[in-house]
Amino acid sequence: MRLLWLTGALALALLIGVLSLQVPAPAGPHAPATAFSAERAMADVQELAQRPHPVGSADHARVQAWLQQRLTGLGLETTVQTGPISRGSARYLRRMGGDPEAANFTAANLVGVLPGRDPALPAVALMAHYDTVPMSAGAADDSAGVAAILETVRAIRARGPAERSLVVLLTDAEEIGLDGARVFWGGHPLRDRIGAVINLEARGGGGRAMMFETGRGNAETIALFGRAGVRADGGVTSNSLAVFVYERMPNGTDFTIPKNRGVQGLNLAFIGRPEQYHAHSAPEVLDRGALQHIGSQALENADALLRAGALPAPTVNSVYADLFGRVILRHPPAVGWGLLALAVALLGVAGWQAGRRAGLTFAEVGRGALDGLWFLAAGLVLTHAVRTLAGPMAARAGSAETYYTLLARLPWMEAGAALTVLALAMAVMGGRARPDRRISAGALAAAAVLALVLGGLSPIVIGAALVAIALSLFPGLAARSAWGGWTGLIALVLGLGAVTQLLAPEAAFLFLWPGLLAAAVAALAALLDPGLTRPAALAPVALAAAVGGGWLVGLSHPVFLGIGLDLPGALALIGLLVLMFIRPLSPERGAVRPWLMAALAVLVLGGAVSGWARVAEPVPAPAAAEAA
């Protein structure tokens, strides 16, 4: 009976997650004038992305002249701002095969202004870069962003005059060092008039456009984004965890420059189809649904800002996340403590009722928490080992060609890591105490050695391996009951939530929201049927697993695309949360051995899928790379 509930819940969770990751259908050329149309924008993409147009190239001059005409034709007051590129940028351009001398070591920004009814009000800027790397026509990066801005301007004009002025900033030399953005924000007369900026980027050729960066102190910005962005075709994909993580990464885009000046705003990008990044990125392979998604979000947010009574001001950072792309749920950071307290109280109700009627003990809850700790530690080790089968870590790539090939292998890496996490979940659900402890510990030690040899020294892998091996050598610590395993996992997740709430409250929702849902369902199930055998208790458990698991599946894909190249263990962390929902649906005792054998088969399949990436996406030979 439980196996049927488990299968149904997982199937529904996968369906919900996959549906939440879909891009909207591209609007056709005859869409309403006030709406964004990807097909209309594609005409600009096709003009821009005929060939690579890096700084200093003949095609760069062609694109620049054509964009000036387009901006003027849209009714914007258009000027060209020039400024020097840095020595470092010039050296980087040369290494990529470009010619900074042909550009006279100069970046040329295109600046267009659509005056508002009250030019004294702070203006809103739409920003994208029009240069490309020498080896790519850049249909996605960033012709899609430029074309989306042109179509957005057209639609805004069709909606009627706005109070605020709109500044269109098409920057140059972004690919070699953000030089164009530095030139504009470093001294253009308009820079101090701009109160909000929306930047459009791409690191791939498709997928949903994620809003992954804001100005600091973003509570008011997120409030506006939550109202305006959800009106966009396909809704929004964004959460404060992405903002928190990106803030601490070494990466930068043009948005970095105004952000560091204290300007509020939004940074949007799609990162699916990673094989197209700085590679073959022609108009015919660009995901038009991705263009519709990023453009529609740019339009709705820019229009809301232009017509707002006051622009968002920096306050505090908000804790927020989208729910299946359709609504933004947000709250102040301090509310996290209240959510944690409520979840602990509900877990207490579940534990008290299960202890009274099902014999649950504190020791069994502790064993359940150790089960979760073993899953997380083993997951970090095994996903890292499986990831290295697909190629070196990014820091050891050795060349640009190897790095871009690794990006192309991301789908294989993701599939391999996901299968690995699934195998571990099956092991926990089947009762990890059953396999020989020496075999389990030895397998984890071998995986750790593989990860360290192929991936390089990693303190995280070493620490996780020690924890996982130690817990494997003491199988008596594994949970023996469904209630012990379930409540222990909830307690572990809430403990992680408490630590995160203390150190990084913007990221704590990842633990607190699912933990609160799981605790509430556990309390309900304990009151309805402590034996966890009747549909009255199993139905809400399965429903929570489907909804909560579906949300986590939708979250896991952009997380892996963003950081999975170097941190594949992020899927193990998300897998722990899914495991928390499905743990009470563990199979009956008689199904343990086939369950564990199936887990081993899934683990082997995960390694094979990841390793196949080397065959499916080989590193191009140097001669082939030069010819490209």
Say what each PLM segment does:
Residues 5-19, 597-608:
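Hydrophobic membrane-insertion alpha-helices, especially the h-region
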Residues 192-211, 336-359:
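C-terminal domain-closing interface element
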Residues 23-330:
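Soluble extramembrane regions of membrane proteins in the secretory/endomembrane system
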Residues 17-27, 610-619:
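C-terminal region of N-terminal signal peptides and the immediate post-cleavage residues
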Residues 18-21, 313-318, 390-396:
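Peri-membrane helix termini and adjoining interfacial loops of integral membrane proteins
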Residues 346-628:
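Alpha-helical transmembrane segments of integral membrane proteins
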Residues 1-4, 589:
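Positively charged n-region of N-terminal signal peptides that target proteins for export
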